[in-house]
A protein has these predicted regions:
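Short coil/turn segments that connect the beta-strands within blades of beta-propeller domains
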Residues: 37-39, 90-92, 129-130, 170-171, ...
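Repeated scaffold domains used in trafficking and secretory/extracellular systems
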Residues: 80-85, 120-127, 161-168, 204-212, ...
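Structural motif
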Residues: 50-58, 102-105, 141-143, 181-186, ...
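Surface loop/turn motifs at the tips and blade-to-blade linkers of beta-strand repeat domains
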Residues: 72-79, 114-119, 155-160, 198-203, ...
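Bacterial Sec-dependent N-terminal signal peptides
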Residues: 1-41
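Short loop/turn segments that connect beta-strands within beta-propeller blades
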Residues: 61-63, 107-111, 146-150, 189-194, ...
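Conserved beta-strand positions in repeat-built beta-propeller and related beta-rich domains
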Residues: 43-51, 95-99, 134-138, 175-180, ...
C-alpha cells in the first residue's frame, strides 16, 4: 500500500516487456489443496490495489504442487483487497487484508472462521496465545486482538502515524511508525500494553525491525518517494545505544528484510522502478559487516524488480517473488542458499510476502 503510487506509475513502462517475458509454468495443480501437508509455503499475493483480486497461493515443496488461489478454492469467495501479510497463532491463521480493513481468521484447514474489523491492517505480532498486536497504515495506533477468542480487545496509542513493522524481544514489542518526521522506534510493555520508551535511529521513517542472534535490533528506515534516504540502524535494546549505522545510496529503496535461519545474515530487496540494474535485486549482509554491499547477491533483470522475499526454515532456500508490474500473474523463484536458481512457478497477482510452515 505505501508504495502503490510508484508501482502504478511504472506499470506502463514495464507492460510490454513483462508480457513478452511471461512464462507459463506447467506445475499448477487442481483447485483444492491438501492442507494436511506439513511443509507449506504460503505466497501472500497482494493483487492490484482497488481491484479486490488478492489471493493466497500455496506451494507444497514435497509434492512440487502449486495452488494459485487456495483460499477461494476452499471458501468459494474472494479474499479481499490488498493481502498484506499472514501469520499463524496456535491452530489459526491471521490474514491482514489492508484495503478491506479486515483481519481474516482461518482454521487450520484454511476454512474461514470469522473476520475482525481493523483499519488498514499491516502485520500481526504474536505476544502470547491470548494476545497479539496488529499494526495499521494511516493510523497512530496498534490494535490488540485475542487470537483465542477472535476478538479486538483494545488499542495502544502511538505518537505518530503509520504503524508498520514490529518485533518482540524480552517482553517488549518494538514498533515502527513509517512517518517521514520520525527518527525513533517505540517500545511497548506487553504486560501492561503501555508505551514505555523510544530509541533514536540514524534515519527517518522507520519501516521494519528485526532481532538478530545477538539480541540486537536492526531498524530499516527511509521513504525514497518522499525524500527520506534509506538507512540501517543496529541498536542495543537494553541500553538504547546505536551500535552501527549504514546509509544507502540516494536512489536505493530497500524493502522487506528477513533474517536467515541462524539470524546472523540479513537479506533484503532493493527496487529500481526505472528498469535499470543499479540498486535492483536481492542483497545480503552479515550482522558484523562494516559496510553495505554495492552488488546484489541475486540480481534482477532489466525492467524487472522483486517484491517478495523469504527464507524457508527447513532447507534455507531463498524464495523471491516477481510481481510482473501487478498487471498479470506473478511468479516465484527459488534459490539455494548459495544463490543457485532451482525452481520457478506461477502464482496469483502481486506476490508480496511468504509464510513458511514446516
Amino acid at each position: 500500500m505505501g508504495r502503490k503510487n510508484i508501482k502504478t506509475i511504472t506499470t506502463c513502462l514495464f507492460a510490454a516487456l513483462i508480457f513478452a517475458a511471461c512464462k507459463k509454468d506447467g506445475n499448477t495443480t487442481g483447485p483444492t489443496p491438501n492442507t494436511s501437508e506439513k511443509r507449506k509455503v504460503f505466497v501472500v499475493c497482494e493483487g492490484s490495489f482497488g481491484n479486490g483480486n488478492s489471493s493466497m497461493s500455496l506451494y507444497l515443496p514435497d509434492k512440487d504442487s502449486v495452488y494459485e488461489d487456495a483460499f477461494k478454492s476452499i471458501n468459494a469467495q474472494e479474499l479481499g483487497d490488498v493481502f498484506q501479510s499472514m501469520t499463524r497463532i496456535g491452530n489459526s491463521y491471521f490474514l491482514c487484508l489492508n484495503n478491506s480493513d479486515r483481519v481474516l481468521c482461518l482454521n487450520e484447514d484454511l476454512t474461514l472462521n470469522k473476520y475482525l474489523s481493523v483499519p488498514k491492517p499491516r502485520y500481526v505480532l504474536e505476544i502470547n496465545e491470548s494476545k497479539a498486536y496488529v499494526s495499521s497504515l494511516y493510523n497512530d495506533k496498534v490494535y490488540i486482538i485475542n487470537p483465542s477468542t477472535f476478538s479486538v480487545t483494545g488499542r495502544i496509542q502511538l505518537p505518530h502515524m503509520n504503524t508498520e513493522g514490529m518485533a518482540l524481544y524480552n517482553g517488549k514489542a518494538y514498533i515502527c511508525t513509517w512517518d517521514t518526521s520520525v527518527n525513533k522506534i517505540y517500545s511497548i510493555n506487553t504486560s501492561s500494553d503501555q508505551l514505555e520508551d523510544s530509541f533514536t535511529i540514524s534515519g527517518f521513517a522507520p519501516q521494519e525491525v528485526l532481532v538478530d542472534k545477538e539480541q540486537k535490533l536492526w531498524v530499516l528506515s527511509g521513504n525514497i518517494a518522499k525524500g527520506k534516504p534509506a538507512a540501517w540502524t543496529r541498536i542495543d535494546p537494553v541500553t538504547g545505544q546505536v551500535l552501527r549505522s549504514f546509509y544507502f545510496p540516494p536512489k536505493a529503496d530497500p524493502i522487506h528484510p528477513v533474517l536467515n535461519n541462524t539470524k546472523d545474515t540479513i537479506y533484503f530487496i532493493e527496487v529500481n522502478y526505472d528498469g535499470g540494474n543499479e540498486n535492483n535485486g536481492i542483497y545480503r549482509m552479515s550482522i558484523h559487516d562494516a559496510s553495505l554491499s554495492a552488488q546484489p547477491f541475486i540480481g534482477a533483470a532489466p525492467y524487472q524488480y522483486y517484491w517478495a522475499l523469504g527464507i524457508e526454515p527447513v532447507s534455507g532456500n531463498i524464495y523471491v517473488g516477481d510481481p510482473k508490474g501487478f498487471i498479470q500473474k506473478g511468479s516465484v523463484m527459488v534459490f539455494t542458499p548459495d544463490g543457485t536458481k532451482i525452481k520457478e512457478f506461477a502464482v496469483a497477482v502481486g506476490p508480496g510476502h511468504f509464510y513458511f510452515e514446516q
